[in-house]
Regions:
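Transmembrane helix-loop junctions and nearby membrane-interface residues
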Residues: 18-31, 60-67, 87-90, 124-134
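Alpha-helical transmembrane segments and their helix-start/interface "positive-inside/aromatic belt" motifs
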Residues: 3-9, 66-75, 129
């Protein structure tokens, strides 16, 4: 079980990203007025990034303790760092939106989208290739 825990964690990460990005965020923007959506999204996105960062760190620890699959050790730490960056720049995104700095908001928001997409891809690749190295 412990040997495959990083695989399970990557599966959870992929599920969280797909659920949040494909279902929750678009539904919020369509179903809730802009002011309430803003409050909710500012509440949920930092937690989203933090949960994935913690899961990635947990995966890294399990792999490091069991001392196997070095590639996935690096993948999990990259996943952790990318989500930590997203978490840390979220307040800057909110400040840019509040100060009507659309250019900065767009750049920072796009960076979180790209970093989250990279996190999705590397965790999906972990799922796809895990069996071939186990």
């Amino acid at each position: 079980m412990m040997k495959n825990l990083p695989l399970i964690i990557s599966s959870i990460i992929v599920g969280i990203i797909l659920f949040q990005s494909a279902l929750v965020a678009p539904a919020i923007n369509r179903l809730i007025n802009a002011e309430d959506a803003s409050v909710f999204l500012r509440y949920i996105w930092p937690k989203f990034f933090l949960i994935i960062a913690i899961l990635s760190l947990a995966s890294f620890v399990v792999i490091a303790i069991n001392s196997y699959q070095n590639l996935y050790k690096y993948v999990s730490i990259v996943s952790f760092v990318l989500m930590l960056i997203c978490y840390l720049i979220t307040p800057m995104i909110n400040d840019a939106k509040d100060s009507l700095n659309d250019q900065l908001w767009t750049a920072l928001h796009l960076s979180t989208i790209i970093l989250t997409f990279i996190t999705l891809i590397i965790n999906a690749l972990t799922i796809a290739y895990w069996k071939s190295v186990s």
